[in-house]
């Protein structure tokens, strides 16, 4: 059996699909389905069982044996960067992951967990070392502190990998609302008004020229499954493309896709409106991120990553296919 926590969420449900593509269906999904819309992410997936997050945590804290477990993909977390209830965030992100680490290492079960590029704060260096880490919100701090906890462990004999996700976009993120990717929001904006809204310049960048390392979720899944295939690899690794691209690049890729749809597609769609940069984000907004991918490449992962010119059209085509169902 393989356990996927957060398995009804964005990245978790895509990992489930990736496992299904390999013919693997002996999967236990762990999640919090108070937002029942997330079940739609699993409607076309095959799994063996579901367990509520709180029930799962209680069982691993008491050391319950859940049978033969091949690996745990831990994607479950409070991922909102605007959540300031520190007790809640630390319980869900930090204490939960600590308990899962102890449970897995005691049983020598491989654990591949989601960290975050947010641990680097404003950057400008995005490399897996303490000197470059300066979290700016509770979410980032909870991820950072667990990475520190892992670094302090001695004598772990099984695989443990933390993946610092950069800006992930792609299918099955619609439940995330305001926390969904800009590609998702641009799709909605172009459908509604034919225009994309971007922030004006900030931190020395021109309008829409703030740059992020945007990575398609299919590439994220590919790395997770490669790690599953290579249990000798452990450590904390960045997971982006290694190339920063601007929000304008994402907008242009979306506009180009809409314009290519023909008569009912994007003839009238394609404007970009630049809106004032919000005061509440000043000093808290990453205007530039770019993963240093040296560590993961050195570990042996050599596949190419999609750029936004490839990944965004693929994603918008998927969204359009969902609208027609």
UniProtKB/Swiss-Prot annotation:
Q: Give the cofactor note text.
A: Binds 1 NADP(+) per subunit.
Q: Where are the transmembrane segments?
A: none
EC category: isomerase
User: Which cofactor(s) are needed, names only?
Assistant: NADP(+)
Write the record's keywords in alphabetical order, separated by commas. Carbohydrate metabolism, Isomerase, NADP
Residues annotated for NADP(+) binding in this entry: 10-11, 31-32, 38, 75-79, 143, 168, 176
GO biological-process terms attached to the record: ADP-L-glycero-beta-D-manno-heptose biosynthetic process; carbohydrate metabolic process
Q: Does the keyword Isomerase apply?
A: yes
Q: Which residues form the active site?
A: 139 (proton acceptor), 176 (proton acceptor)
Q: Which GO terms describe its molecular function?
A: ADP-glyceromanno-heptose 6-epimerase activity; NADP binding
Query: Family, per the entry?
Result: Belongs to the NAD(P)-dependent epimerase/dehydratase family. HldD subfamily.
Q: What is this protein called?
A: ADP-L-glycero-D-manno-heptose-6-epimerase
């Amino acid at each position: 059996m393989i356990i996927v926590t957060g398995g009804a969420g964005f990245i978790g449900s895509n990992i489930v699909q990736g496992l299904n593509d390999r013919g693997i269906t002996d999967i236990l999904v762990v999640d919090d389905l108070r937002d029942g819309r997330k079940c739609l992410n699993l409607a076309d997936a095959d799994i063996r069982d579901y367990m509520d997050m709180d029930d799962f945590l209680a069982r691993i804290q008491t050391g319950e044996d859940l049978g033969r477990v091949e690996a745990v993909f831990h994607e479950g977390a409070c991922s909102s960067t605007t959540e300031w209830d520190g007790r809640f965030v630390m319980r869900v992100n930090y204490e939960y992951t600590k308990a899962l680490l102890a449970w897995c290492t005691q049983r020598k079960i491989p654990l591949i967990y989601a960290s975050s590029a947010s641990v680097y704060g404003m950057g400008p260096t995005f490399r897996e070392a303490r000197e470059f880490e300066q979290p700016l919100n509770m979410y980032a701090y909870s991820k950072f502190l667990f990475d520190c906890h892992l670094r302090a462990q001695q004598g772990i004999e099984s695989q443990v990998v933390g993946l610092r996700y950069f800006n992930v976009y792609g299918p099955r993120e619609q439940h995330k609302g305001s926390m969904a990717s800009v590609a998702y929001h641009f799709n909605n904006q172009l459908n509604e008004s034919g225009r994309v809204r971007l922030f004006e310049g900030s931190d020395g960048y021109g309008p829409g020229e703030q740059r992020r390392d945007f990575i398609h979720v299919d590439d994220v899944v590919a790395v997770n499954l490669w790690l599953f295939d290579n249990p000798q690899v452990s450590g904390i690794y960045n997971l982006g493309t290694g190339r920063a691209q601007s929000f304008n690049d994402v907008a242009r890729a979306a506009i180009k896709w809409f314009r290519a749809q023909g008569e009912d597609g994007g003839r009238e769609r394609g404007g970009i409106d630049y809106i004032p940069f919000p005061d509440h984000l000043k000093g808290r907004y990453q205007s530039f991120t770019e993963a240093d991918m040296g560590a993961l490449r050195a570990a042996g992962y050599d596949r190419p990553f999609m750029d936004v010119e490839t990944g965004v059209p693929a994603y918008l085509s998927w969204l359009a296919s969902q609208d027609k169902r």
